Regions:
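Conserved thiamine diphosphate
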Residues: 137-177
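Conserved acidic/glycine
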Residues: 1-141, 151
């Protein structure tokens, strides 16, 4: 098959050989990246120590120092009160508490926000006209939702969460593998 593709494309280069024209263009793009990185670093270095430290914490996938304490308080509250509520309501209560503490937390739901309680009072909708939000309305797209969350988690610096009902989980499975 490889030979047929080479023949069809009239590809005269050896395996793993990059044509000079392509290599030259690729290196130009790399040089642009170096310039952009220098600009970004100049802006970043002007930020306050607090902002820089918070950014570095987030991008290195570390939780805030007091985060476990916050979770312990929530667990104790549920253990002591033993509320008679649906699991999605107890989950919403926890999400409500941690959303304000973790700027790297981005939530969303596949058209079920009101039912599965994934949207909090701290949630701001992420949309094409405003990328500063922390909540995504995926629409009826469980497969896309799971794939997007996997991509965010893989990139790092973002902790995604989402919600759907168990009956719709089969739509997510290809993206969850």
């Amino acid at each position: 098959e490889v030979d047929l593709v080479r023949k069809k494309l009239k590809w005269k280069y050896k395996p793993f050989e990059v044509p000079k024209e392509i290599l030259s263009e690729w290196r130009k793009i790399g040089e642009q990246g170096i310039v952009q990185e220098k600009k970004w670093n100049a802006v970043f270095n002007k930020k306050s120590k607090k902002i820089k430290d918070e950014f570095l914490r987030i991008i290195s996938n570390k939780l805030p120092n007091d985060f476990n304490k916050l979770l312990e308080v929530q667990k104790k509250k549920f253990f002591d009160l033993k509320p008679d509520i649906a699991s999605r309501q107890s989950s919403a209560s926890i999400i409500e508490e941690i959303t304000n503490s973790l700027p790297e937390l981005i939530g969303g739901s596949a058209d079920l926000s009101g039912s599965n309680n994934t949207k909090t009072k701290h949630s701001k909708i992420l949309k094409p006209s405003n990328f500063s939000g922390n909540y995504i309305h995926y629409g009826v797209r469980e497969h896309a939702m799971a794939g997007i969350m996997n991509g965010m988690a893989l990139h790092g610096g973002i902790i995604p969460y989402g919600g759907t009902f168990l009956i719709f989980l089969d739509y997510c499975k290809p993206s969850l593998r």
